[in-house]
């Protein structure tokens, strides 16, 4: 257990901060500043180790920084299941993984790992998803392949069909990994966030190519123990039902 990290206290501090805010800064800006202060203070004790779906530059990496600030030691993992193993095995203090996208729906790898793993959901963070088409080259007409995570391909399917209908679409385990594929070939493009363009030195061929402007992804924070209540908490319930008529009704009846 990480004694010096108290997410329940942080949540109360953030609520008080927003309640007392009369401007000129927006609540989100104040919370971001305080998050960085807390993150820096925690690092003076010992930097938190947080496993995330990597490599650096993924949306999960961005969600980690939004939730924990800039000072934790990020541990990039190749697969969602690896994040769970890092937390379960105490290799990392915490983990963060995507669980649901407003367009693509649930992330099945996360649900599968939740059903078999022994970790707790201790927090959540939602971030807007803005997809960019990135490449080493600068000519959209020269692109022959597009690498991206399957969720990104789904979320940009209309744009891809209209603008790159004849190119080969190749799935990767993360959008940042897709960006690394685009680094060495001007005829290859990747779908990723703007941060990935900076990290991997790529040009933005097209901005905001997602099919819906309301595209967002919810991430869950994983830990080995349930933290104290903050006064603004949620409970997650996961269950499976048999494939027969009335099974879902029977389960929901327990909660009614």
Pin down the residues of each PLM region.
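Domain-level signature for soluble enzymes in the chorismate/prephenate branch of the shikimate pathway
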Residues: 1-256
């Amino acid at each position: 257990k990480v004694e010096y990290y108290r997410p329940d206290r942080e949540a109360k501090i953030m609520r008080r901060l927003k309640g007392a805010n009369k401007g000129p800064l927006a609540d989100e800006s104040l919370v971001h500043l305080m998050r960085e202060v807390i993150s820096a203070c925690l690092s003076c004790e010992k930097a938190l180790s947080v496993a995330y779906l990597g490599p650096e530059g993924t949306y999960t990496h961005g969600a980690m920084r939004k939730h924990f600030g800039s000072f934790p030691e990020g541990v990039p993992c190749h697969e969602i299941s690896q994040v769970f193993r890092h937390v379960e095995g105490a290799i990392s203090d915490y983990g963060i993984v995507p669980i649901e996208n407003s367009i693509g729906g649930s992330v099945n790898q996360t649900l599968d790992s939740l059903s078999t793993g022994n970790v707790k959901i201790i927090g959540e963070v939602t971030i807007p998803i803005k997809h960019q088409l990135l490449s080493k080259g600068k000519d959209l007409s020269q692109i022959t392949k597009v690498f991206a995570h399957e969720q990104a391909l789904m979320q940009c399917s209309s744009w891809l069909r209209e603008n790159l209908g004849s190119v080969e679409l190749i799935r990767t385990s993360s959008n940042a990994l897709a960006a690394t594929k685009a680094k060495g070939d001007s005829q290859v493009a990747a779908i990723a966030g703007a941060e990935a363009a900076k990290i991997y030195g790529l040009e933005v061929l097209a901005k905001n190519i997602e099919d819906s402007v309301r595209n967002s992804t919810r991430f869950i924070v994983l830990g080995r123990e349930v933290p104290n209540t903050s006064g603004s908490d949620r409970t997650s319930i996961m269950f499976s039902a048999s494939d027969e008529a009335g099974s879902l009704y029977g389960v929901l009846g327990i909660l009614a």
